[in-house]
Amino acid sequence: WLMIVEQKCNIIVMLAKCYENGTRKCEKYWPEPMKTSQFGSVFVTNVEEMDFCGFVQRTLNVSAELQNNKINLTLKQFHFLKWPDHPVPLSTSHLLKMHRAMRKLVDESKTSSPIVV
């Protein structure tokens, strides 16, 4: 989360499920909806989750104090849910839908912050 704050990232893309076939694939690094979690000196609040067919879009508020500067960010996480562990998705339609939603946000934000994948 410190990297997100330091780089002022406003988009995170996640292509894996946390669990698949009973096996952990990725750590869940965000809180439940309307909850706040602390990660070191960074506080993350899950403000909203919107479930689209094939992916979830989350709005996360991130706050931290770095070198006596308070930083507050609002970012979007795009979590793709249709990518199987093996082999590849049967269709690209859900991934393309998520990509279009992400690109729209990038175009509207007019920032040059990096996208975290």
Swiss-Prot record:
Pfam hit, one: Y_phosphatase
Tyrosine-protein phosphatase domain location: 1-117
Substrates-to-products reaction catalysed: O-phospho-L-tyrosyl-[protein] + H2O = L-tyrosyl-[protein] + phosphate
Family: Belongs to the protein-tyrosine phosphatase family.
Gene Ontology terms, MF aspect: protein tyrosine phosphatase activity
Amino acids binding substrate: 85
Annotated InterPro entries: Prot-tyrosine_phosphatase-like, Protein-Tyr_Phosphatase, PTP_cat
EC number: 3.1.3.48
Designated name of the protein: Tyrosine-protein phosphatase 26
Keywords on record: Hydrolase, Protein phosphatase
